[in-house]
């Protein structure tokens, strides 16, 4: 009969697995850091693209290139004959015939370079994404579960290029002076969707998955829910802002808080059928942009007051900055309207939307995944 064996018998040293202290976590940490830096680069590039797009619209340059050539369009006109051909194509548009008739080649080049620059930066952004994505895959730097997220950013970027041409094409139709406002809203909304996803990914990658799982147990669901509602309302406000920009609604009704001496603008529902007023009536569109701004302020203040009761200092500070930016963005919007939407205020107001939605996402993230805090830090 075999001898008895203690259940506490030690395993011989030769049987023990080789220890690799911290090896796996270090590799995962490096991968998360690399992906995070990559997305940060893309985030900055998208912010620049939104600014270029805004200036392209404000300079009325968006219809200067009348064809969509994703590859060959990267090369601009190289001689006088090529420039004349581009100008001749632009002369066929309603915008030229009704607004820019007689435009010189030198004047045309200014608006052409704005639109070409906007498209070229988009191409560059696509190349950076593709090279970075392939490089991260080749070096096995992508953490588990993140390949699909990175691929999603690329797919949305490609879809954004298609949406951009879909928008421009609407402005090239006979009788159109500008792009369709609802298509502009789709184009801008998609840009902010991409930007928001990138911001959220950057926040998540800044901490280990295990830490996030632990932090979520201590999260404030009600406060995170308030931030989520504020995020959705801000997204709606950005879309309405795009409609305002698309029909130049910000240049009319420059009094505040009233509109032409009343709370609602005159002829608010003058266009038939009624729903077209929501897209085409400058007074109606601006009215809803104002009202949504007021609602944002109320909900934002409520979220800030709720955050003041949080024991987490970092969470409270995040909502402080969000509230400051929300107030600043509203003031900036009022100034933009009262000055009849000059280009420099309009572009700053658009950039303010980028900052605001990023700060809302950060506040939501810290409400959902609070940072660890000592008793002394909470005092």
Curated annotation (Swiss-Prot):
User: Could you state one GO cellular component term attached to this entry?
Assistant: plasma membrane
Q: What is its EC number?
A: 1.17.99.9
Superkingdom is Bacteria
Q: Which UniProt keywords apply?
A: Cell membrane, Heme biosynthesis, Iron, Membrane, Metal-binding, Oxidoreductase, Transmembrane, Transmembrane helix
Where is it localised?
Cell membrane
Coiled-coil portions:
none
Q: Does the keyword Glycoprotein apply?
A: no
Q: From the record, give the transmembrane residue ranges.
A: 35-55, 124-144, 150-170, 183-203, 227-247, 287-307, 318-338, 341-361
Q: What is its main location?
A: membrane
This protein's record includes keyword Membrane: yes
Which residues are recorded as binding heme? 289, 349
Among HAMAP family, the record links this protein to: HemeA_synth_type2
Protein known as: Heme A synthase
Q: Which organism's genome codes for this protein?
A: Jannaschia sp. (strain CCS1)
Q: What is the lineage of its organism?
A: Bacteria, Pseudomonadati, Pseudomonadota, Alphaproteobacteria, Rhodobacterales
Instruction: Report which gene this protein is encoded by.
Output: ctaA
């Amino acid at each position: 009969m075999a001898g008895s064996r203690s259940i506490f018998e030690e395993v011989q040293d030769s049987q023990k697995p080789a220890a690799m202290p911290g090896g796996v976590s270090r590799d995962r940490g490096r991968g998360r850091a690399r992906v995070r830096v990559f997305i940060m680069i893309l985030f900055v590039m998208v912010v620049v693209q939104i600014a270029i797009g805004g200036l392209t619209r404000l300079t009325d340059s968006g219809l200067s290139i009348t064809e969509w050539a994703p590859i060959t369009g990267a090369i601009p006109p190289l001689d006088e004959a090529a420039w004349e051909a581009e100008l001749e194509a632009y002369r066929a548009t309603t915008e030229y015939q009704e607004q820019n008739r007689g435009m010189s080649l030198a004047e045309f080049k200014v608006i052409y370079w704005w639109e070409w620059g906007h498209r070229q930066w988009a191409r560059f952004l696509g190349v950076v994404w593709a090279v970075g994505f392939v490089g991260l895959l080749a070096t096995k730097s992508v953490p588990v579960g993140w390949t699909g997220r990175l691929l999603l950013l690329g797919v949305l970027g490609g879809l954004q290029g298609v949406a951009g041409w879909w928008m421009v094409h609407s402005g090239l139709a006979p009788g159109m002076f500008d792009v369709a406002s609802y298509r502009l809203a789709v184009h801008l909304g998609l840009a902010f969707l991409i930007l928001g996803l990138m911001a959220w990914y950057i926040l998540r990658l800044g901490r280990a998955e295990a830490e996030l799982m632990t932090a979520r147990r201590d999260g404030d669901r009600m406060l995170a829910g308030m931030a989520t509602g504020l995020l959705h309302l801000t997204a709606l406000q950005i879309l309405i802002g795009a409609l305002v920009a698309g029909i130049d609604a910000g240049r009319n009704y420059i009094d505040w808080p009233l509109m032409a001496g009343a709370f609602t603008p005159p002829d608010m529902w003058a266009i038939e059928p009624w729903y077209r007023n929501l897209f085409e009536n400058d007074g109606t569109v601006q009215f809803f942009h104002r009202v949504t701004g007021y609602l944002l302020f109320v909900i934002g203040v409520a979220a800030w007051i709720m955050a003041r009761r949080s024991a987490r200092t970092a969470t409270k500070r995040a909502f402080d900055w969000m509230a400051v930016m929300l107030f600043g963005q509203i003031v900036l919007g009022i100034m933009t309207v009262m000055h009849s939407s000059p280009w420099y205020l309009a572009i700053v107001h658009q950039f303010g939307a980028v900052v605001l939605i990023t700060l809302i996402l950060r506040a939501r993230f810290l409400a959902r995944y609070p940072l660890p805090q000592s008793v002394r830090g909470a005092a």
